[in-house]
Structure formats: structure tokens, C-alpha cells
Design a protein with these regions (language model features):
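Short beta-strand elements
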Residues: 49, 56, 183, 189, ...
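Glycine-rich loop/linker segments at domain edges
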Residues: 94, 174, 180-186, 250-251, ...
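Phosphate/diphosphate-binding loops
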Residues: 271, 278-279, 467-513, 737-766
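Thiamine diphosphate
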Residues: 422, 441-466, 470-472, 691-698
Length: 959
């Protein structure tokens, strides 16, 4: 049908089906700010518009209802290309990060401020209940509103946006807004979905209803007859290449234990067939016509079931080692089962035994653990269990692939463009020079987009059909067909003396990797390697085993194992302090590491090889603990006016890493253009974290150019150079250092060229703002533009281009302490987080406003994991809450009443400008801090996630 309405002040005529969703119509009409994060569930708010003067979800309005309507989208906020006052304030406040629904948030806040020019905190909170923010948390949204009112009323910001650091630097350590902030908050077409042409074919995946079954037969004949079906891909017509989906560098530490399509499905939602069709409707019809005959097999869902005698085996095929094969491999492989099991290929030994469902194992330690326990006055041994958690990025997994000049070109939302290229090359048997990966802006990743979960099949489908192919996960598929956080059982035994000295620690970790071994060794290793080095204890040991099961797959998630290990060890430490009758704070301060302490425990905690033993570098633990204890008034017992509510306090010390020393590698190229501007090509992948801004700031500090004369191009495998990727908190440390190296090397080339053109000595020259070389001796100067123009003249020496590379074995470790005050209702079991304070040492925070928002966002995720989030599986392994509403992601109403993030000022010796990582560590503290606070309030030790009212009441003996 055809109808008239007004969109952003312009009368338009639109044509669509009467029952089409208005969101889809608006998006096709060019309103890219109106996005869909929840498949029309009405949870995320990414589709928010103003409809006849009121905020509405566009997915809830059908096309026929829009006749004569007045519609405004976020595009209406712009004046030409200029942002409105709310959008400017959002960028300044640091909340425009992955930004998939940032335009919707800007529209919501603008609408509110037009109705209520000076809203209260409660009024801001009320209007933001309609939008889900996963990346930046909610706290700085209050600041953004304050900044917006100041800009509107006074023409400038008056409030402090964030503390500033390093006064000798111009932009590093100062809030100045992201270089891509305007594009993101205004709704520019910067995401993968915005690059998909009208003629793209869709890819639909038919998935298994069984948790474990052999495929006996697949009949696709009727489906293939449908007009508009280009191909149906199955295990029968795709490569038998085994590979891993984990986006990790060489040597790959995850087993190659899957194909594009397996002859044995290993979880509900596993791939059975891929349908390339002209439209989603045709694909759905084709899927219904495919006839699959299954042979259901026994399944295991927990580590306890997986390790049981006679348990069904998740993998029971041939095992291959590319290095380090055991002597009994031939005998081992004689026990292999049905040929439909496939293979498991190891690049090196992982301590695996698939005949016991063990995907990986490792053990080690320092000192004499038994001697340490013998010296203890008290010993506590406790077990803590974590749940299966979904990342829930606002942008689901998505990929667009097409053929161009005989090459496979892929637009991806990925953290690891170079790993995507390598793995797609392997799966499709295409040389890497025939693959071009373009990393678009990423609408949230948190580790899930480190894994190659959709790019493998999308790329293959486009390559074999020659069609432009678009694939996008449904929100339900995000839960049952994607990666999740590894559920873990962490058992900690800890001994201590009466004075609080810890004499020994033993950690036993049992992790559930699901049906495939993505990150199966490295995530559980992190639960030890980013936890045990917090302790200055002579006797420590660990024993970890990782089990295959038939649950939805596990993979990388922000924190990467550390939140689970931290939860177990800090809770046990609090239990030990309680048993010894000493103050928990005293025990923490007595036993944590400090600068210079040699971390011998790291020797056994490498990724498949010996780890680097290094001393503790810059460490802000003392200050973080002391300041946090002052803020929360540690030692003061709070009493509620209502006797049913009991109040308690807790905290946890935390650490992470800054990339993987000895494994990670980053590169960048800096080019001086003919007008004196600079383009920096970085291999790094900005996920909304401000990495491109860090790179631009590095160039600014070195070359003294205005920020607007610096452009950063990143994550494009054709135009950029190699970078391991954005994971393991490597962005600032590795990619930032590579950009800094490129800028410094370009400065050297500029000075050398200037010395020739100016007839001066190089050592007499330097650079200064606004972009020129000057002589410290003669006072002569030449602009970068004049210098570059002359260099590329016919008799010049060519364009000045510099390469920067960064590798290191040095370790820059961020530290911190997270504090919680909770109230527990001893009648209902309800838990309220009243206060949450995150104090972190990040070295020099290059983008302090963005750093604070990353701390808020990661802390909110961690609070969600602790109290609300939990993937629930039925008895057949099917996820029964595969949507955002039922899953339990926290919204603004679940945010702590008093929420603060504090940057502890230390300077690191190795990071760019003294910086360390900031975001991932903030996932580690909430569970133990809240758990210890709950015990302080009501005496119950919460031994599993999520910490629910039912568990409180059970602990109190009331149910």
C-alpha cells in the first residue's frame, strides 16, 4: 500500500505491505539510526522514534498505522552535519562507545529535555528505562544530560567531564571526544548492515533440534526446486576441513574439532544446513522442505555428567597432532567410534583426552603446597560455581560477503580481522591475497566477536555461489548458536596463620567448554593466571580440567576466565578471614603483591608453552584498597530503619593483563600527505573502545598536529598491516604502541627530509604546532605541507611513510579493587546493590572519559552476571530463555544507587605514554564484592551465580 506521512519534517510518500514493521520501512527509506537489537521484542530500544510527539518503538508500529503521522528519527537532530547539543554532550561524556543505539539514546534525551529542560535524576532514570545500554553503563548518561543543559544554556560545558592526567601532554590523559563519535551518535551508515545492497541474497541456517545426534541423511531435493534458492549447503557438499572458530593467533591453542557442517550435531542449534536464498521468506520455505533423518545419541550437560564413568562422548573420532603427538596415539585412535564423529586436530598437546570428554588440562605450582597447609592455623576449602552467560551485544553477529574482481570481500563486525582472513582462507581453500576483510564499526563484542562464528559460513556461501550473501543472527541464535562464557566450578583450598598470613593456596578448576574447544585451554588458564599472581604467597598450586559437553558453545568473553577465578579465590579468602577471626581488609593488605615482587607462578601458566616470569611492575593496589575502604567506610556497620533489611559490605582485589606478551604483535603505518596532514593505517580493531582515538592522540603528541588533521584507518586487511586483534586487553598496549612507534618513525623521516630541504643538521631540528619543522639554531621553519609537496616533486625523494611495529615480553598489569554495599531482605531474600565503587589502576588513561565509561559498563555486566543473568537449559539441552527479557540483562533500574568509578594514578614503564588496559579488568570484581557483602549482611555464603533471593532464603534455612 501507499501512504503519506512526515519524516523529519519532510512530507513523503512511502510504499510497503500494510503489516510491514515501521522500523524496516524507515531503515529502507534511509533512516539508518532506527536499528533492531531484539527482533521486535521491545527490550533494547534501538528502534526508538518520536511518533506523533511521543517516544515509540518503531518495531511495534505497522506501516498502515502511519498514514498522516509525524515521525522523527535521530537524523532530525542534525543541522546539516552539525550535531545537536545532546549529541555533542554524549560524545563529550564518553558514552558513545560501540554506539549501536546511541542515536536512539540521543533522540530520547533530546525529547526529554524539550519537555523538561532541567530534569531530576529520577526523571532521567525514568526515560532511560526504555533503552538497554551494555557498553558504557548508565552513570555517565546523567553526566551527559548535565553537560547538554550547560551547552544549551551557557554555550559551553561547565562540569568536569573526567579527571585529567599528565599535564606535560596535550591530549593524552585529557577528555577530548572520540574521533568517530560524531559518525556514531548521528546514525551514519557505519555498521555491516548499512553496507548490504538491495540485491544481496540471504543466508539462513537450519539448526539441530537435538543436543547430540548423527545425521543419517539429508534430503534437500524439494527445497532446491524452489525458485530463488541458489544453494543448500550441508556436510555432504562442503569441505571436510577441520578448523577452530576461536580468533586466536599462532600457534593456535584451540583444537580443530569442527567442520562448516558436521555429520554429528553436538548441541541444540548446531548447524545442519545453510540455505542461500533470494529472500528470508524463500529461505524459510526451503528450510521447511529439507528432510533430515537423525540418530539421537546420549548427551552430557554438566562437567559432573561429562566426567562420570561411562558418560556419552561428545567427540570420539580420530585424533591428530601437528606437533608433540603422544607415543600411544595409534592405540588411542583404535578406540575411535563412528566415522561421522569427524576429527580433532591439535597444533600442540593440550592435556586432552576426548575419551574422557577432557578438552584440555593443565596443572602446576610453586613451593611446597603440603608444607604450606601443614603450617596453617586454619584451612578453608570451598567450591564456587558460575553460570552460562551470554554477551548480548546490541548488534548481533552479522556478515556480508561478495565477490569483487575475483576476490572474496567481506564486511565484518569483528575484533580480529586478520584472524578472520586466515580462518576463512583455511576453510574455503582460498589464498589470503584473494580475501579482503573490512572491519566495520562493531556494535558490541565483549569477546564474542573475537570468534569467527558467522564469517566462515558466510564467506564460503558467497565464494561457492558467486552471490552477494548477507547473514545476521536472530537474537535467539545469539544464545544457542553463538559463544557464551564458560561455566566453571572453582574449588579453592586456602590456609592461613592467626596473624592473617596465607601459607598455601590450591585452585581446582573444572570448566565446561560446550561441544567445541574454542579457547578451551586459555580461558580456564586465565582463571588462575590472572588471579594467583595477586598473592605474595610462597606455596601455590592449580589443577584445571576442561570438559566437552552438549550445551551451547563457550568461547571468549570479557574477563576471559578471570571473573570466575577471582570469585572463587576472594570468597574463600573472606571465609578464611572469618574463620581466623581477623578483619578481611587486613588479610588482603597483608598478602597482596607489590611492585618488584617476582611472579614465579606465571612459569606454568603460558598458553601451551612456558610462561614469562616477570616482576610486578607499576601497581596501584595499595591506593585502590585504601581509597575504596575510605569511600565505603569499611568497618562501619550500617543499620537499616527496616529490621527486615540487613546491610553488608565487601570488596575484592582484581587484576588483568595488557595483551599477551611474547604472543601478540601489532603494526601501523603513518603517511604524511601532500598538504601536511597525516593518515595512520592501524591494524588494530576499534570496538567502540576509543582505540582509533588513542592512535590519533599518539600522532598528535609526536607530530604536534591538530587532531582534525589526523585520520585513522583501521582494521582493513588491504590498506592496513597486521595486528593480532582486539582481545586480551591488547588494544591500548599493543596497537597503541604500534601507532606511537609509527608516529615517531614518521617524525624521524620528516626531520631527515627537512634537514635536506632547509640545509640544516637533523639534530638542530624539531617539530612544533600547528605542524611544522623549525630550527633551534637559525629559527627557520617549514610547514609539513610545503615539506611534503617538495618531497614528492619530480626530483624529490618521495612520500614520507613510516612503519611501526610492537612486540614485547614485558608485562603491564592493571590492578584494582571493587567495593559493594548491599541490602538483603531476610524475609524475601531480595538483594539490592546500594553502592558500588570501582577503583582501578590503568596507568595513564589516554581517554579518561571513555575509560570511566568502560569501567561502568563492565562493572554493570559483572553485576548482571552476579545477580540476574543465567542461560537456562531444559532437560534436552535447549535454551528456554533465549531472549533479552527472560534472560535477565540488567537495565538502569538495576544500577547501584551510588555508583562510582575512580582512576588510580600510576605510570607504567611499557605502555604508550604509561598506559595500561582498563575495560576487561572491570568485569572481575562484582561477584566476590557482592558475595562478601551478602555474607556480611546476613551470614550466607553465596556459592553460585546468579545470587538469587531463593539462594539467600535457602542459606538462611527458610526454604
Amino acid at each position: 500500500m501507499e501512504l503519506k506521512c512526515r519524516i523529519n519534517g519532510e512530507e513523503v510518500v512511502l510504499c510497503a505491505e500494510p503489516t510491514a514493521r515501521l522500523r524496516d520501512v524507515l531503515y529502507k527509506a534511509g533512516c539508518h539510526s532506527v536499528r533492531d537489537s531484539d527482533d521486535a521484542e521491545g527490550f533494547a530500544g534501538s528502534d526508538t522514534i518520536i511518533f506523533n510527539g511521543e517516544l515509540k518503538y518503531a518495531n511495534f508500529i505497522l506501516f498502515y498505522q502511519t498514514e498522516g503521522a509525524e515521525i522523527k528519527t535521530a537524523e532530525s537532530l542534525l543541522n546539516g552535519r552539525e550535531l545537536n547539543y545532546v549529541q555533542k554532550a554524549m560524545v563529550a561524556a564518553g558514552i558513545v562507545q560501540s554506539a549501536y543505539n546511541a542515536p536512539a539514546a540521543a533522540l530520547i534525551l533530546t525529547w526529554m529535555l524539550e519537555k523538561k529542560p532541567h530534569p531530576t535524576r529520577e526523571e532521567i532514570k525514568e526515560v532511560l528505562t526504555s533503552i538497554f545500554i551494555r557498553d558504557a553503563g548508565y552513570e555517565h548518561y546523567y553526566l551527559a544530560v548535565q553537560l547538554a543543559t550547560e551547552l544549551r544554556d551557557f554555550g559551553e560545558f561547565k562540569s568536569e567531564i573526567a579527571p585529567s592526567f599528565r599535564p606535560h601532554l596535550e591530549v593524552v590523559g585529557k577528555p577530548c571526544g572520540k574521533v568517530d563519535g560524531a559518525a556514531l551518535v548521528s546514525g551514519e551508515p557505519v555498521f555491516v548492515e548499512d553496507k548490504v545492497p538491495e540485491n544481496a541474497w540471504c543466508l539462513h541456517v537450519l539448526r539441530s533440534p537435538f543436543a547430540s545426534a548423527y545425521i543419517k541423511s539429508i534430503d534437500t531435493s524439494e527445497a532446491e526446486k524452489l525458485p530463488g534458492v541458489a544453494a543448500i549447503l550441508t556436510a555432504y557438499n562442503t569441505p571436510e576441513t577441520h578448523y577452530m572458530q576461536a580468533g586466536q593467533g599462532n600457534p593456535e591453542p584451540s583444537p580443530h574439532d569442527r567442520r562448516l557442517f558436521n555429520m554429528k550435531v553436538r548441541h541444540v542449534g548446531d548447524r545442519v544446513a545453510g540455505i542461500v536464498a533470494r529472500t528470508p521468506e524463500i529461505a524459510d520455505k526451503a528450510a521447511a522442505l529439507i528432510k533430515v533423518e537423525y540418530e539421537p545419541q546420549g548427551a552430557v550437560y554438566t562437567v559432573e555428567e561429562a566426567m562420570a564413568e561411562g558418560a556419552p562422548l561428545v567427540h570420539n573420532g580420530e585424533v591428530i597432532y601437528n606437533a608433540g603427538a603422544p607415543d600411544d596415539l595409534a592405540a588411542f585412535n583404535k578406540l575411535a567410534g563412528d566415522e561421522r564423529e569427524g576429527k580433532v586436530v591439535y597444533q600442540f598437546p593440550l592435556g586432552a583426552d576426548i575419551h574422557k570428554n577432557i578438552a584440555a588440562s593443565n596443572k602446576g605450582g610453586i613451593g611446597d603446597i603440603e608444607k604450606g597447609f601443614a603450617e596453617a592455623d586454619a584451612i578453608v576449602e570451598s567450591t564456587y560455581q558460575t553460570s552460562q552467560i551470554q554477551h548480548t551485544p546490541l548488534e548481533p553477529h552479522v556478515c556480508y560477503a561478495h565477490i569483487e574482481h575475483g576476490r572474496l570481500v567481506m564486511n565484518c563486525a569483528t575484533q580480529v580481522p586478520y584472524h578472520v582472513r586466515r580462518i576463512v582462507s583455511w576453510v574455503c581453500n582460498i589464498p589470503e591475497n584473494k580475501i579482503h576483510i573490512i572491519k566495520e564499526r562493531v556494535g558490541g563484542g565483549y569477546g564474542s566477536k573475537q570468534d569467527i562464528l558467522v564469517e566462515d559460513l558466510t564467506g564460503y556461501a558467497a565464494w561457492v555461489t558467486g552471490k552477494p550473501v548477507y547473514y545476521r543472527n536472530t537474537r535467539a541464535e545469539e544464545f544457542y548458536a553463538n559463544s557464551t562464557r564458560h561455566p566453571m566450578r572453582v574449588k579453592v583450598k586456602m590456609g592461613g596463620k592467626k596473624d592473617g598470613t596465607i601459607t598455601a593456596i590450591f585452585m581446582e578448576v573444572c570448566a565446561n567448554t560446550g561441544p567445541f574447544g574454542n579457547h578451551c585451554l586459555t580461558v580456564p588458564m586465565n582463571s588462575c593466571s590472572k588471579v594467583l599472581p595477586l598473592f605474595a604467597v610462597d606455596n601455590m598450586a592449580y589443577d584445571l580440567k576442561v570438559f566437552y559437553t552438549n550445551t551451547p558453545p563457550a568461547g571468549a568473553y570479557q574477563g576471559y576466565g578471570t571473573p570466575k577465578g577471582t570469585y572463587g579465590i576472594m570468597m574463600t579468602m573472606a571465609e578464611l578471614a572469618d574463620k581466623l577471626g581477623i578483619d578481611y581488609r587486613t588479610m588482603v593488605e597483608k598478602n597482596h603483591v607489590s611492585e618488584g615482587y617476582m611472579l614465579e607462578i606465571l612459569k606454568g601458566l603460558g598458553e601451551g608453552r612456558e610462561g614469562n616470569v616477570v616482576p610486578v611492575g607499576s601497581c596501584g593496589l595499595d591506593e585502590a584498597i585504601a581509597k575504596g575502604c575510605d569511600m565505603i567506610e569499611w568497618g562501619k556497620k550500617e543499620v537499616s530503619d527496616d529490621p527486615d533489611w540487613k546491610i553488608g559490605k565487601g570488596f575484592a582485589m582484581i587484576m588483568q593483563g595488557s595483551g599477551l606478551p611474547g604472543l601478540d604483535h601489532a603494526e601501523a603505518i603513518a603517511k604524511l600527505e601532500t598538504d601536511g596532514t597525516v593518515i595512520l593505517n592501524s591494524g588494530g580493531a576499534d570496538l567502540g573502545t576509543g582505540l582509533d582515538t588513542i592512535s590519533a592522540k599518539a600522532v598528535k603528541e609526536v607530530l604536534k598536529l591538530p587532531m582534525e588533521k589526523i585520520t585513522v584507518v583501521s582494521g582493513d586487511t588491504d590498506s592496513c598491516v597486521f595486528d593480532t586483534g582486539a582481545y586480551a586487553s591488547s588494544g591500548t598496549f599493543f596497537s597503541g604502541n604500534a601507532s606511537l612507534a609509527a608516529a615517531k618513525n614518521l617524525k624521524e623521516k620528516i626531520l631527515q627530509e627537512a634537514a635536506l630541504q632547509m640545509d640544516e643538521k637533523v639534530e638542530d631540528l624539531d617539530v612544533r604546532a600547528p605542524g611544522e619543522v623549525y630550527s633551534k639554531v637559525t629559527g627557520n621553519a617549514i610547514s609539513y605541507g610545503d615539506l611534503s609537496h617538495a618531497a614528492i616533486a619530480g626530483d624529490g625523494r618521495g612520500q614520507m611513510v613510516a612503519h611501526g611495529s610492537y612486540v614485547t615480553t614485558a608485562s603491564s598489569v592493571p590492578y584494582g579493587a571493587h567495593f559493594a554495599q548491599v541490602a538483603v531482605n531476610v524475609k524475601t531474600g531480595e538483594i539490592k546493590v546500594q553502592k558500588f565503587y570501582a577503583l582501578q589502576d590503568a596507568g595513564t588513561p589516554i581517554n579518561p572519559e571513555i575509560a570511566l565509561c568502560q569501567m561502568y559498563g563492565a562493572s554493570m555486566k559483572s553485576i548482571g552476571h552476579t545477580l540476574y543473568e543465567d542461560m537456562k537449559l531444559d532437560e534436552n539441552g535447549k535454551c528456554i530463555n533465549a531472549n533479552l527479557t527472560d534472560y535477565g540483562t540488567p537495565m538502569i533500574g538495576e544500577a547501584p544507587d551510588d555508583f562510582k568509578a575512580v582512576l588510580i594514578d600510576v605510570e607504567d614503564a611499557y605502555g604508550p605514554f604509561g598506559a595500561k588496559s582498563i575495560s576487561e579488568i572491570a568485569c572481575n570484581g562484582a561477584a566476590p564484592a557482592i558475595g562478601i557483602a551478602i555474607h556480611d549482611a546476613c551470614g550466607v555464603w553465596m556459592r553460585s551465580w546468579p545470587m538469587t533471593p531463593e539462594k539467600v532464603l535457602k542459606g538462611l534455612g527458610k526454604i
